[in-house]
UniProtKB/Swiss-Prot annotation:
This is Elongation factor 4. GO terms for cellular component: plasma membrane. Residues 6-188 form the tr-type G domain. HAMAP family: LepA (MF_00071). The gene is lepA. It comes from Carboxydothermus hydrogenoformans (strain ATCC BAA-161 / DSM 6008 / Z-2901). GTP binds at D18, H19, G20, K21, S22, T23, N135, K136, I137, D138. It holds the Pfam family EFG_C. It is found in: Cell membrane. CDD domains: EF4_II, EF4_III, LepA, lepA_C. It catalyses: GTP + H2O = GDP + phosphate + H(+). Its main location: membrane. The keyword Membrane applies. The lineage of its organism: Bacteria, Bacillati, Bacillota, Clostridia, Thermoanaerobacterales. It is a peripheral membrane protein.
Amino acid sequence: MPKRQELIRNFCIIAHIDHGKSTLADRLIEFTGALSERELKEQVLDQMELERERGITIKAQAVKLTYKAKDGNTYYLNLIDTPGHVDFTYEVSRSLAACEGALLVVDASQGIEAQTLANVYLAMEHDLELIPVVNKIDLPNAEPERVLKEIEDVIGLDTSEAILASAKTGQGIEEVLEAIVKRIPPPRGDEEKPLKALIFDSHYDPYKGVIAYIRLVDGFIKPGMKIKMMSNDKEFEVTEVGIFKPYLTPVEGLWAGEVGFIAAGIKNVRDCRVGDTITSAENPAKEPLPGYKQVKPMVFCGLYPVESNQYEDLRDALEKLKLNDASLTFEPETSVALGFGFRCGFLGLLHMEIIQERLEREYGLNLITTAPNVVYRVVQTNGEVLEIDNPAKLPPAGKIDHIEEPYVKATIMVPKEFVGNIMDLCIERRGVFINMEYLSENRVMLTYDLPLAEIIYDFFDQLKSRSKGYASLDYEFIGYRPGDLVKMDILIAGEPVDALSIIVHEDKAYYRGRQLVEKLRELIPRHLFEIPIQAAIGSRVIARETVKALRKDVLAKCYGGDVTRKKKLLEKQKEGKKRMKQIGRVEIPQEAFMAVLKIDNNK
């Protein structure tokens, strides 16, 4: 009888968005009979309504499969599902740390994409055994030979044992399972050593508290044990231990090498950090597990409730989301224009959109968001360095020596006929050309250094539209560089509106200011007085538009007449003015705050 550990395989699936990762997971679950026919729905592991709707995987999930291999042994396969989108790289790296191997899924018609490559490099850092799987070979335009050659040339993997599969028709699924058993090594761990377990995810259950998803490296864990978190030394008693099928199923205990979950009455999310190491309180391990780094948010924006009495609800909702999402940060802030709200930090634009949608959908909140910002470094004349995530906090121009902005290294893969369009786009966005490499006769990999601020507006949309949807993008943060940046204020009726301030590059300031005031003129409703809208840098106004006044002579049709009649009309007019939601004296609709995002950034 082989040892328990030798029958365990922990693996994940790496793929670019839409290469069929979740469908492949469905087929593996179906083939091994982990779920009954009734429970099988498409994309079983994408349990969030939003994930199913957008067809993307956001949260990492896990499931335990039982597979009787051709060698007669029954193996336990732990599949840890990972997201493919660039914003969720931290989810991927945590899932990889819990595995010994990975299926590298590549679409037979699309070939290697930018994020496939990024995730492969992550997997190689974790020394994972990679099994190439060419998926979607049932498509009429599939070119498996070309894709296999790409995998060999670009990634340098031997594809002689690559598997051709179709997750849709179920072809090649058994070969995939056999390859997992044969080629992925079993976990190495010692049940006798003190407990060491990696938390790779968590979610909050209103009855049980925080449920931590863990991969045991050494030792064992059972209900009733006292455990300790190694980052903050907090102690808890385990109340429940279980595995994923993919629904949570309690078991008697977990041993080294296994993947499962624990509940320990943890009420505060901060005590259960993803990436932390759990150990036993009586017999603690000396060293925590390596490889966890605190994720830093890259994009910030303000979230404000439309009704000010929802402020507490918004705080509760953010606290709950943070339980599931280690990378979300938030702190309270106030704005003259919008009242009380929160400054939230996200990994990228998709992450921001999803959090916002979850707040509105799952918690029924009505929100106003301000324009997204990146974190700027401001070096003051006295040598002090400030990190600014909100343009309103920028010190006066006289105190600033220079401003530095974050840059990313962007890798763009694109068919050769669109290379010109994409290079134009990168130049418009102040990109610095680094490299261009032909992956095959008709696919090119471009590398640019770009300011992050230029990517977070609509770079991705533009990239897709200029390449007819064929380009794919991956980016990583490379550091700060000085730039000619200025703060642009928007004044409405002479009052600066803090929520509309943006930090822009000097060359684009006039153009952006011009566009923004024109857009605001369309969006701000006409009032009974003239409203000037100005864009200003410091005290210099660079663009101005005026919202014309509505006709206000309510007494014009009275021609003499009784004074009470005139009074009635004047009173009525007064009532109307009261009804306006005021900022200073002007009602600014929510669309106006979003206008900052929608400006065409191309000139």
